[in-house]
């Protein structure tokens, strides 16, 4: 809240005017607050100067003193405003009263010196008068008569202040100045030269570093190109080894094994033992005709047509007889020929006929399979099963992964080489 000067306004103004009036004997007035309010009242006035006023200051209150003193330099009256905040005042009251200082300075206007005091050391009369003397400016006195003129006899002639210019000293002084100017210039040039050399060395080191990096990069590129072929072959070999190990670790499907054997045997039977020789369709037909009786007859019966073939003269194509003998020598045993010459459809029908008898309740459930190994699902999109479990409703989505309903009815993916189809 703002300070209240209107409640006790006439008394405050009267005390202030008594101090300002030079004809009045009152030379100080003291103001303070009424209790804890912001109303200002007159705490006291006096004619005893600073010594008397200092005795009235209370260490537990916030007070404002306005004094009239005489300037020790000029002898003119000066006014001093003292903002007193006692050491016993609490911090809240100090903060509230700090905003009133400017208002009180406006009311007690005309002060030449303003002092903010908190302890008795700040309001000692000697200290206050020193501040007044410093604030008055030049040390001079008024209304003091100077000593009267006294005749002391003839005065000596006034001497000239002219001094002849000394060329030597002037040259020395100028030379000294030029010497120091030259020294400063040389020092500045030396610093600039050192800075320039340091910059050149830095640029040279940077250039050498870049060239070294370029050379090293070129060498690395050259070594990489030289070793590129060997590294590529090595990588291909390692990849092939990894694929081979993975293929060996994965269990093979029985049907795949059977197909691989069938393809291998068919390739062996079709391939020619001696490439480059011509085959006669007529002789090949003669060899394929007795296949059926060969599988039923004894070895003696089989050797009889071979002897007939060798005795029959073939003058027109003599090389073909040699080829016939060689083909006859490399023929597979009759049992193996009979086994692999049977139609695949008949074998599949025979192989699939047995599981159908063992699983009669799978009709209408789509493509079904029997688990050969146990498998645990890696996530919720896969199914788990144990050996001999049945998987129904299979969808062939990939060569290595199928989808179907597991034993628990959950639909998900599973590896194709872990099951065997039931047809």
From Swiss-Prot:
Where N6-acetyllysine occurs, residue numbers?
A: 176, 285
Q: Which domain of life is it from?
A: Eukaryota
**Entry-linked SMART domains:** ADF, SH3
Annotated localization = Cytoplasm, Cytoskeleton; Cell projection, Lamellipodium; Cell projection, Ruffle; Cytoplasm, Cell cortex
Keyword entries, A-Z: Acetylation, Actin-binding, Adaptive immunity, Cell junction, Cell membrane, Cell projection, Coiled coil, Cytoplasm, Cytoplasmic vesicle, Cytoskeleton, Endocytosis, Endosome, Golgi apparatus, Immunity, Membrane, Phosphoprotein, SH3 domain, Synapse, Transport
- InterPro entries membership: ADF-H, ADF-H/Gelsolin-like_dom_sf, Drebrin-like_SH3, SH3-like_dom_sf, SH3_domain
Q: Which residues form the SH3 domain?
A: 364-423
Provide ranges: composition bias, Basic and acidic residues.
240-264
Q: Which residues form a coiled coil?
A: 180-227
Q: Compositionally biased, Polar residues: which spans?
A: 265-274, 283-292
Tell me where in this chain the PTM Phosphothreonine is found.
26, 288
List modified residues, type Phosphoserine. 160, 266, 269, 272, 280
Residue ranges occupied by any ADF-H domain in the UniProt entry:
2-133
Domain comment quoted from the record: The SH3 domain mediates interaction with SHANK2, SHANK3 and PRAM1.
Instruction: Spell out the subunit comment.
Output: Interacts with SHANK2, SHANK3, SYN1 and PRAM1. Interacts with FGD1, DNM1 and MAP4K1. Interacts with ANKRD54. Interacts with COBL. Interacts with WASL and WIPF1.
Biological role:
Adapter protein that binds F-actin and DNM1, and thereby plays a role in receptor-mediated endocytosis. Plays a role in the reorganization of the actin cytoskeleton, formation of cell projections, such as neurites, in neuron morphogenesis and synapse formation via its interaction with WASL and COBL. Does not bind G-actin and promote actin polymerization by itself. Required for the formation of organized podosome rosettes. May act as a common effector of antigen receptor-signaling pathways in leukocytes.
* UniProt family annotation: Belongs to the ABP1 family.
The molecule here is called Drebrin-like protein
Organism, as annotated:
Bos taurus
Its lineage reads: Eukaryota, Metazoa, Chordata, Craniata, Vertebrata
The coding gene here is DBNL
């Amino acid at each position: 809240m703002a300070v209240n000067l209107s409640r006790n306004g006439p008394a405050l103004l009267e005390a202030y005017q008594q101090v300002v009036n030079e004809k009045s004997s009152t030379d100080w007035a003291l103001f303070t607050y009424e209790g804890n309010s912001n109303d200002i009242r007159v705490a006291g006035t006096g004619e005893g100067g600073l010594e008397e006023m200092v005795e009235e200051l209370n260490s537990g209150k916030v007070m404002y003193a306005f004094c009239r003193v005489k300037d020790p330099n000029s002898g003119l009256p000066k006014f001093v405003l003292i903002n007193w905040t006692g050491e016993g005042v609490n911090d809240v009251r100090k903060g509230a009263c700090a905003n009133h200082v400017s208002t009180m300075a406006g009311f007690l206007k005309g002060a030449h010196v303003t002092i903010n005091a908190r302890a008795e050391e700040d309001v000692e009369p000697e200290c206050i008068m020193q501040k007044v003397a410093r604030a008055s400016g030049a040390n001079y006195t008024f209304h003091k008569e100077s000593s009267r003129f006294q005749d002391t006899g003839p005065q000596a002639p006034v001497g000239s202040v002219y001094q002849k210019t000394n060329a030597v000293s002037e040259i020395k002084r100028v030379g000294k100045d030029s010497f120091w100017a030259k020294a400063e210039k040389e020092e500045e040039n030396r610093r600039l030269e050192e800075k320039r050399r340091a910059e050149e060395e830095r640029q040279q080191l940077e250039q050498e570093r870049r060239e070294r990096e370029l050379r090293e990069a070129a060498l690395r590129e050259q070594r990489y190109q030289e070793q590129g072929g060997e590294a590529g072959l090595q990588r291909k070999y390692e990849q092939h080894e990894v694929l081979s190990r993975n293929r060996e670790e994965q269990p093979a499907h029985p049907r795949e094994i059977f197909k691989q054997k069938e393809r291998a045997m068919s390739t062996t039977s079709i391939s020619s033992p001696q490439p480059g020789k011509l085959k006669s369709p007529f002789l090949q037909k003669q060899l394929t005709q007795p296949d059926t009786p060969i599988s039923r007859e004894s070895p003696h019966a089989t050797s009889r047509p071979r002897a007939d073939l060798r005795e029959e003269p073939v003058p027109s194509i003599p090389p073909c007889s040699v080829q016939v003998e060689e083909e006859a020598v490399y023929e597979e045993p009759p049992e193996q020929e009979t086994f692999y010459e049977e139609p695949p459809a008949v074998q599949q029908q025979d192989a699939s006929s047995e599981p159908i008898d063992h699983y009669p309740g799978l009709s209408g459930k789509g493509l079904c399979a029997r688990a050969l190994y146990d498998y645990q699902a890696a996530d919720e999109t896969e199914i788990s099963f144990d050996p001999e479990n049945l998987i129904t409703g299979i969808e062939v989505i990939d060569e290595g992964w199928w989808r179907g309903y597991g034993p628990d009815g959950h639909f998900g993916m599973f590896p194709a080489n872990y099951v065997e189809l039931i047809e």
